[in-house]
Amino acid sequence: MSNIRLIKRRIRVAKNISQVTKAMQMVAASKMKKAQEKAVSGKPYAQKILELVGELTKGREIDPMTYPLLSKNSAKKNLVILISTNKGLCGGLNSTLFRSLNNWIPKEQETDFVTFGEKGRLLILRLGKNLIADFSSSLFLNGVGGLLKLIVDGYTKGEYGQIYLVYNNFL
């Protein structure tokens, strides 16, 4: 008789767990939908900014004194800013990003890395690359000021010839 009670109790516990899981999925789906709407609503602005910068620099002589960030730089070292997640619960998001990065990294040039996201930091350290800054522990917007200073100073002082931003693009 106690076996039947035990089995019924386990069935009830399993149903409760199932209900909690469904509720969590609904909350996650709602949050995901809001995040997707924000990403989609910002896309036209990002596209227009890229077009404007392209038009401003296309076929024109750029005065390095006036626009130092738009002038050519002959430094051989590159800077890669890698934006990844802090946790791994995101399907193939990080693995696809890291595979693409690993295939793309210029092998013949010296490259420094800056990371946003714990998973990106761990990858760069595992690959034995030169990690000069990590903003994983701070909120993204809190780290932007330090990152901008690093980028502008590194480029204007001739430390970096090219600066790349590596991230997942929401389609």
Regions found by a protein language model. Name each.
Residues S2-L171:
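Conserved loop-to-helix interface motifs that mediate assembly, gating, or partner/ligand docking
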